[in-house]
C-alpha cells in the first residue's frame, strides 16, 4: 500500500448523484484529499461537466467522466468512494482490484452475489462496506444490540419493530440500514427470529419471534430510523435521523482516511472498524 503521508488522491464513483455530489463537495473542502477523478455512468447528462460546479461548488478542474483516471504517480495515496447504484458497482470493484486501490462502498441494495464479489475483492484490497456511512447510525446499531441483549428475556417478552423513513426517490425497501439493525438485533434474539415486512389484513397476534419492518417514502427525507423495543407496561424508542446528506458523505470520507492513515491491508471492514467498535 502507498505511504500514508500527503493528501489522498480521491476518486468518487457516482459523482453526479445526490450523494456523490456531497462527497465531491466535502472532499474538495478537506485538505486531506485531492480530487483526481469523478466517475458517472456512460449515459449521464453531466459527462464533461466540472464536478465541482455540478456539486454546487467552485470549479474543481476535474470533469465528470465515464472513464477511470490514470494516476501519474503510482506511489500516491489513492482511494475510491462508491456512492452509485447496484448495477454500477461491479465495474467499480473490478477497477479497484485491478489498480490496487482501497475502496469505500456506500451503495445499498446489493445482491447476495455482489456482496460475495466484495468479499472476494477484499482478499486483494482493503474494502470498507456498510449499509450506512453515518457515524450516529452505526453508534445507534451498537446501542440497539445492547438494549436487545439486556431485555430479550424480560418477563412478558420483548417486541422489536423497525420504522424507516426516506425520500421518495429511494429505490430499495426496507433500507439497508434497517436490515442491518434487524440483523444485529436478531443475532441477540436467536436463530428462531422471523422478519415481517409490514402487516395487512387479519394477521393474528404478533409472535414473540418477529422483527417487524415498516418503510415510509415521503418528500426529501434524507433518512430516519426508529427502533421500538416494546414490553408490557413500557417501551424504548431509539431514534436516529439525518438532517441532511452530509453525515453520509463525511462518514465515507472518514472511512477513506481510516483505510489510508491506518495503512490497512486487504480485508473487508465495516464502519464499526472505522469507529473502533468492532467485536473482532
Curated annotation (Swiss-Prot):
InterPro entries reported in the protein's UniProt record: DapB_C, DapB_N, DapB_N_CS, DHDPR_bac, NAD(P)-bd_dom_sf
Location(s) in or outside the cell: Cytoplasm
Keywords from the named record: Amino-acid biosynthesis, Cytoplasm, Diaminopimelate biosynthesis, Lysine biosynthesis, NAD, NADP, Oxidoreductase
UniProt record similarity statement: Belongs to the DapB family.
Positions annotated to bind NAD(+): 14-19, 40, 106-108, 130-133
One Gene Ontology cellular component: cytosol
Coiled coil: none
Record's protein name: 4-hydroxy-tetrahydrodipicolinate reductase
Molecular functions per Gene Ontology: 4-hydroxy-tetrahydrodipicolinate reductase; NAD binding; NADP binding; oxidoreductase activity, acting on CH or CH2 groups, NAD or NADP as acceptor
Amino acid at each position: 500500500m502507498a505511504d500514508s503521508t500527503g493528501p489522498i488522491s480521491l476518486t468518487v464513483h457516482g459523482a453526479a448523484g445526490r450523494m456523490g455530489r456531497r462527497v465531491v463537495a466535502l472532499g474538495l473542502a478537506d485538505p486531506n484529499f485531492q480530487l483526481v477523478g469523478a466517475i458517472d455512468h456512460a449515459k449521464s447528462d453531466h459527462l464533461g461537466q466540472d464536478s465541482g460546479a455540478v456539486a454546487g461548488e467552485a470549479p474543481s478542474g476535474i470533469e465528470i467522466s465515464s472513464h477511470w483516471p490514470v494516476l501519474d504517480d503510482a506511489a500516491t495515496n489513492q482511494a475510491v468512494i462508491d456512492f452509485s447504484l447496484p448495477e454500477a458497482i461491479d465495474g467499480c470493484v473490478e477497477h479497484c482490484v485491478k489498480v490496487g486501490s482501497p475502496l469505500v462502498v456506500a451503495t445499498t441494495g446489493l445482491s447476495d452475489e455482489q456482496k460475495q464479489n466484495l468479499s472476494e475483492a477484499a482478499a486483494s484490497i482493503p474494502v470498507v462496506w456498510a449499509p450506512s456511512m453515518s457515524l450516529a447510525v452505526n453508534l445507534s446499531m451498537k446501542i440497539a444490540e445492547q438494549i436487545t441483549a439486556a431485555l430479550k428475556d424480560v418477563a412478558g417478552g420483548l417486541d422489536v419493530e423497525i420504522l424507516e423513513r426516506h425520500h421518495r426517490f429511494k429505490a430499495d425497501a426496507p433500507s439497508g440500514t434497517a436490515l442491518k439493525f434487524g440483523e444485529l438485533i436478531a443475532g441477540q434474539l436467536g436463530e428462531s427470529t422471523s422478519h415481517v415486512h409490514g402487516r395487512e389484513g387479519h394477521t393474528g397476534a404478533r409472535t414473540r419471534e418477529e422483527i417487524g419492518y415498516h418503510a415510509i417514502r415521503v418528500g426529501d427525507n434524507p433518512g430516519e430510523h426508529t427502533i421500538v423495543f416494546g414490553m408490557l407496561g413500557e417501551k424504548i424508542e431509539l431514534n436516529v435521523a439525518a438532517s441532511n446528506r452530509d453525515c453520509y458523505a463525511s462518514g465515507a470520507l472518514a472511512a477513506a482516511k481510516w483505510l489510508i492513515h491506518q495503512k490497512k491491508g486487504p480485508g473487508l471492514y465495516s464502519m464499526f472498524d472505522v469507529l473502533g467498535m468492532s467485536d473482532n
